[in-house]
Amino acid sequence: MRDIDSVMRLAPVMPVLVIEDIADAKPIAEALVAGGLNVLEVTLRTPCALEAIKIMKEVPGAVVGAGTVLNAKMLDQAQEAGCEFFVSPGLTADLGKHAVAQKAALLPGVANAADVMLGLDLGLDRFKFFPAENIGGLPALKSMASVFRQVRFCPTGGITPTSAPKYLENPSILCVGGSWVVPAGKPDVAKITALAKEASAFKRAAVA
């Protein structure tokens, strides 16, 4: 069983995926893995999300997790579908305690110091900084990281292929989350693979 730190270190960019059509699940996963991005966050925002997770985890090399996990029940459902990690937009005590009890690799969302302190109280120290660009971007994250030196982040929300490398220069950032690698609409496998190759080459100060 992987912990969330090891998941975050696998690739510089974690694609944030919204699967609308179950037929797209396998080709998207294959294209991303072929491009060097093997950590796939499938958001639980569509009716076919859990089924998509089951399909994508069968793709060799794919490490599949669930995003938009809002409560303990959703975490359990994602775990049953075979997820290796779980991402939430925020953090509640109930969700955090449940994840710790289940030894689940949870990456909870934080937006301020109080959120981080709650996570630390629950035994968590890896967080999704969300929605990154709307809450001050890299300057805000740098300020937060200077206070919580043991914490590592995955900023998500408004990250672009232009801004991602700047975030990854910060040693408190293990990876970034982004949706740009899978543009909306019917998947263009060649384009997804090309975007993934570009993103997988981003350098990280926090990961040798």
UniProtKB/Swiss-Prot annotation:
It catalyses: 2-dehydro-3-deoxy-6-phospho-D-gluconate = D-glyceraldehyde 3-phosphate + pyruvate. It is found in: Cytoplasm. Keywords: Carbohydrate metabolism, Cytoplasm, Lyase, Schiff base. The record marks T156 as: Plays a major role in determining the stereoselectivity. Its main location: cytoplasm. It holds the Pfam family Aldolase. Induction: The eda gene is monocistronic and is transcribed from a single promoter. High-level expression of the gene can be attributed to very efficient translational initiation caused by the high quality of the ribosome-binding site and stability of the mRNA. It is an enzyme of class 4 (lyase). Pathway: Carbohydrate acid metabolism; 2-dehydro-3-deoxy-D-gluconate degradation; D-glyceraldehyde 3-phosphate and pyruvate from 2-dehydro-3-deoxy-D-gluconate: step 2/2. The active site is at E41 (proton acceptor), K128 (schiff-base intermediate with substrate). It comes from the Bacteria. Its EC number is 4.1.2.14. GO terms for molecular function: (R,S)-4-hydroxy-2-oxoglutarate aldolase activity; 2-dehydro-3-deoxy-phosphogluconate aldolase activity. Pyruvate binds at R45, T68, K128. InterPro entries: Aldlse_KDPG_KHG, Aldolase_TIM, KDPG/KHG_AS_1, KDPG/KHG_AS_2. GO terms for cellular component: cytoplasm. Involved in the degradation of glucose via the Entner-Doudoroff pathway. Catalyzes the reversible, stereospecific retro-aldol cleavage of 2-keto-3-deoxy-6-phosphogluconate (KDPG) to pyruvate and D-glyceraldehyde-3-phosphate. Belongs to the KHG/KDPG aldolase family. Homotrimer. This is 2-dehydro-3-deoxy-phosphogluconate aldolase. The gene is eda.
